[in-house]
């Protein structure tokens, strides 16, 4: 992830806030959130199996980064300790589970519900940090977690009462939550590793393992890897270039100019942007329970993020 409270680490960044005018970074941040918001729409447009779309999304994101890594960081790979390499591999497996489950969830539930629930990973990061890293849970964090759980309950009850979008909203929502849990595992696995391993080599190792994991999932599912029409290949490339490279590259650039808390909370614009795009491009109107519950979940995430950074 970009920071401990975001979903992905994909490109180099600086942790400090650099001086200079903030207008361009803020505009860039808005553009990046818009690019990330297209991810769910592109997955919905694709007719390929979820694991295949996820595999090519990760593969096409990894290839240009691998070129940079070989060109500038070749010696860094040999310096990675075996224990750190294993940790990076585990992070990659967690990332594979995240993409596979989230992409699959979009086949069963609404874009708004899926993206909102998968974005809840900061809550699981906070819980995991408390359970495994012995980090303290402050009152804002606890309150944010409870608030977000309440939002999930609202969405789930709305699904049970009917009126929700999707052929099996309960399954789709559960898969999205699994995606959030896996993303949290990815963040927690990488938190300590990033203090010792340079970013680009770390990302290349993680994404290579993630691509391999998704390839295995696709093969076990019996999904074809080739033979797709040009439209599908364009969608695969769009997933890598838009949400993968453009979105997160610009976010990492913005992190060098803006406060990390602002960037972290701004990522909550993804569910809003995705829901708007789904309404316009897919004619998908989220159910009232999804809107209300999603708002509660997002409020809980904001409270948790502020408690973790305050």
Language-model regions, residue ranges each:
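Glycine-/small-residue-enriched transmembrane alpha-helix faces in small-molecule transporters
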Residues: 1-56, 60-64, 150, 162-192, ...
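Hydrophobic transmembrane alpha-helices of multi-pass small-molecule transport proteins
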Residues: 2, 89, 128-129, 137-160, ...
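Hydrophobic/aromatic residues within transmembrane alpha-helices
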Residues: 46, 53, 57, 105, ...
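Juxtamembrane helix-entry segments on the extracytoplasmic side of multipass membrane proteins
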Residues: 22-25, 47-55, 80-85, 142-145, ...
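Alpha-helical transmembrane segments of compact multi-pass small-molecule transporters, enriched
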Residues: 60-64, 117-131, 209-213, 265-281, ...
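Hydrophobic alpha-helical transmembrane segments of multi-pass membrane transport proteins
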Residues: 34-38, 42, 68, 89-108, ...
């Amino acid at each position: 992830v970009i920071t401990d409270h975001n979903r992905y680490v994909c490109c180099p960044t600086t942790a400090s806030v650099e001086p200079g005018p903030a207008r361009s970074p803020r505009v860039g941040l808005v553009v990046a959130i818009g690019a990330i918001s297209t991810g769910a729409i592109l997955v919905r447009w694709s007719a390929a199996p979820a694991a295949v779309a996820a595999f090519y999304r990760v593969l096409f994101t990894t290839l240009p980064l691998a070129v940079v890594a070989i060109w500038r960081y070749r010696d860094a790979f040999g310096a990675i300790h075996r224990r750190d390499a294993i940790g990076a591999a585990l992070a990659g497996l967690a990332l594979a589970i995240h993409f596979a489950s989230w992409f699959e969830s979009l086949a069963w539930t609404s874009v708004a519900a899926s993206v909102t629930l998968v974005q809840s990973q900061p809550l699981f990061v906070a819980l995991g940090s408390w359970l495994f890293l012995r980090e303290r849970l402050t009152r804002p964090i606890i309150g944010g977690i409870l608030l977000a759980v309440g939002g999930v309950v609202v969405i789930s009850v709305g699904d049970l009462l009917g009126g929700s979008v999707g052929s099996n909203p309960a399954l789709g929502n559960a898969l999205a939550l699994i995606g959030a849990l896996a993303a949290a595992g990815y963040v927690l696995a990488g938190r300590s590793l990033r203090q010792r391993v340079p970013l680009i080599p770390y990302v290349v190792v993680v994404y290579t393992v993630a691509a391999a994991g998704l390839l295995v999932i696709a093969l076990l599912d019996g999904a074809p890897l080739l033979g797709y029409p040009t439209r599908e290949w364009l969608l695969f490339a769009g997933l890598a270039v838009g949400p993968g490279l453009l979105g997160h590259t610009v976010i990492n650039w913005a992190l060098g100019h803006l406060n990390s808390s602002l960037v972290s909370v701004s990522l909550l614009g993804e569910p809003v942007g995705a829901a708007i795009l789904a309404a316009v491009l897919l004619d998908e109107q989220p159910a009232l329970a999804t809107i209300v519950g999603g708002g509660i979940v997002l409020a809980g995430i904001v409270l948790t993020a502020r408690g973790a950074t305050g």
